[in-house]
Amino acid sequence: MNGVFDLGGTDGIGPVDPPAEEPVFRADWEKAAFTMFSALFRAGWFGIDEFRHGVEKMDPALYLKSPYYKHWIASFEYHGKRTGKLDLAELDRRTQYYLANPDAPLPEHGPNQELIDFANAVVPSGAPAIRPTDKEPRFKIGDVVRMSSDVPFGHTRIAGYVRGKVGRVISHHGSFVYPDSAGNGRGDDPQHLYTLQFDATELWGEQYAEPNVTTTFDAWDPYLTLVTAPEGAAA
C-alpha cells in the first residue's frame, strides 16, 4: 500500500543526519514496548509482516511526528483490536487512571520462563523466515527483470521507487515467507527471493543519478517479470 512509511526517493525530506551518540532507548516506556513485542509475537497476536502492516495502518500525521516505539505501540493496539485480545475500552480506562495517578504502582506479574527462553533465543538473531516450497525458481542469476508496477492495497515489500523498474538478478536466496501473503493474514505462501541490481539512472533518471552507481533490492518471485535471459540460458 502507499503511505508515508515508504519514503525511499521522496523529495523534500532533507539529509539523514542521526546523532553521533543516539541512545538505544530515549525513555523507560520504550523498554517496555521492546519487551512487549516478543510477548505478543509469542502469544500469536501477529507475525512479523502483520506487525509491519499494523504500523502502516497508523494515521499518517501521527506516524510522522511520533517516535519509533510509538509505531510499535500503535501496531500492538491495532492487532489487539483485530484479534479481539485487547479490550480498547479497558485500555482507555487504565490509561486515564495512570494519567491521573502517575505515581500509582503498575500491576505486578511473575516471570514467565518460557517467554524468557523464547526471547533469549529470538531477540539476538531473529526468527528464520526460510520456508520450503515445491515451486521452481522462475529466474536465474543474470536475468534482466522488471519489477511489478502494481500498488497493492494491503501490505507489500515493493518500494515505490522500484515499481516498474528494470534490474538484473544477481543472487537467489531460496524460498521465504511471502510478505504480501503473510502480512495480510493469508499464510506464509513461500516464494523464491532474489537480490536485484538497478542502475542509478534507471531509478532516478539521467539528470539526477550519480554516475557509476547501482542499488540492490531484495524482491520476491511474484514481483518480477522476465525482460531478457542471459545469453545461452534457457528462458
From Swiss-Prot:
GO MF annotations for this entry?
Answer: nitrile hydratase activity; transition metal ion binding
Q: Which portions of this protein are annotated as coiled-coil regions?
A: none
Q: Which UniProt keywords apply?
A: Lyase
What range does the record give for the signal peptide? Answer: none
| Catalytic reactions on record | an aliphatic primary amide = an aliphatic nitrile + H2O
Is Metal-binding among this UniProt entry's keywords?
Answer: no
Q: Does the keyword S-adenosyl-L-methionine apply?
A: no
Q: What is its EC number?
A: 4.2.1.84
Task: Classify the source by domain of life.
Answer: Bacteria
Biotechnological applications listed in the UniProt record: Industrial production of acrylamide is now being developed using some of these enzymes.
Pfam families recorded for this chain? NHase_beta_C, NHase_beta_N
User: Any idea what job this protein has?
Assistant: NHase catalyzes the hydration of various nitrile compounds to the corresponding amides.
Q: How does it assemble?
A: Heterodimer of an alpha and a beta chain.
What family is reported?
A: Belongs to the nitrile hydratase subunit beta family.
Q: What is the name of this protein?
A: Nitrile hydratase subunit beta
Q: Which gene encodes it?
A: nthB
